[in-house]
Amino acid sequence: YFGESTKRGSDCIGQYGEGLKLAMLVFARLGMDVVIKNGANETWKPSLEKDKLGVECLTLDITPASRKDGHFDVVINDINEEAWDLIRSWFLRLTPAAVVQKTSYGELLDDPEFTGKIFVRGVYVCTRPKYEFGYNFFRVETGRDRQIPSSFDINFSITMIWDELAKRGDAATHKQLYKGLASEAAENEAFDLRQPDGLTFAMVSEFKKEYGENAIPVSSTSEGSDLEHLGVATVPLPQRLVSMLRRTLPSPERVRQDHAEKIVARHALGELTKEERANLDYAFRKLE
């Protein structure tokens, strides 16, 4: 019996119970030599035959078998090297990335060959140009036909993956994430609506390592050009990264305000000249 999925709630990729039937139909239409070893007792061969109305239908030629194991195997014969290379690229199980950062929401694929490639539970879905990394999402849904996931789902998963990686405290990973934000990679749009605390703190730490404690981020060279005389260095960066860093670091306006309110020196009342004392008394009277 087939035609119903038993994979729900398991670690298997399938869900709707139609994948095998559709695959057999494609194989039959292409005239490919496919043998399906269905457990220990049966062998299936898909083909197309016409029914009484002359309509081509998918049929299965089922023959008895006697195998020691009860495995379910699909054997596709006569695949050329070019087709095999293409098929391998669709599955991370067959072609794993060289460097993988795994989290509970998915994997960040830090491998030039996988840059921009989007996988869902190990199966290739699409390519996103200008991404800094590739991704294998665990909790994104693609639907029965494996459509491209929604941008919201992708962006949410990216923020969660980056946040988990940032919280691990690995210096090399922090540097890679900071590089991605500083390079205006396309996945940075994920942080327009959500900037996780763990990632923010890690990026602030990377910023201070590179530019020092007296530096602040700005979105243009003119934004903080008047702060140099205060001993403050301004660093032009992409707006999204500036927005994230300013959750902790001050803006130019805040630096100016703090400087204006800063006490430069303290003087005892007896140290004032007669003129300074007169000015102070005048100021107090105005406040009464």
What do these predicted regions represent?
Residues 56-64, 75-239, 245-288:
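GHKL/Histidine-kinase-like ATPase module
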Residues 1-78, 82-83:
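GHKL (Bergerat-fold) ATPase N-terminal catalytic module, capturing the glycine-rich phosphate-binding loop
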